[in-house]
Curated annotation (Swiss-Prot):
It is found in: Endoplasmic reticulum membrane; Mitochondrion outer membrane. It comes from Homo sapiens. It is a multi-pass membrane protein. The gene is MGST1. Residues 3-9, 97-99, 149-155 are lumenal. It catalyses: RX + glutathione = an S-substituted glutathione + a halide anion + H(+). This is Microsomal glutathione S-transferase 1. Conjugation of reduced glutathione to a wide number of exogenous and endogenous hydrophobic electrophiles. The chain crosses the membrane at residues 10-33, 63-96, 100-123, 129-148.
Amino acid sequence: MVDLTQVMDDEVFMAFASYATIILSKMMLMSTATAFYRLTRKVFANPEDCVAFGKGENAKKYLRTDDRVERVRRAHLNDLENIIPFLGIGLLYSLSGPDPSTAILHFRLFVGARIYHTIAYLTPLPQPNRALSFFVGYGVTLSMAYRLLKSKLYL
């Protein structure tokens, strides 16, 4: 059985934990940003959310879409689609004993790409900014998966 103190002393695992915390915090901020834009623009997706602004027919005018709210919401969904695989594969990769400098480079590239992707999505910056940052992050996750499968799972 693995001694938990050894895992907590491992440089790669602690780097992964640090970068995972950063990227999860960023993803949580996207939830807050979505709520902020919904409240300030009075745009809601569910009838029960409109109660504070009116009743009956008056409340229905707040059930609409808004370009800004939708942009933030799509950026958040994109985070969910990319960060969750990174967390799973990154955890397994960090526990597989990779070279520390290579592993930390993977983690930094992913976090940097996802932060830039959010900036490119919300600003919005012209393409291919968002696409390039997406593919960098996706490529990092694929690279970790490949290295993990090749070195530890004997494929």
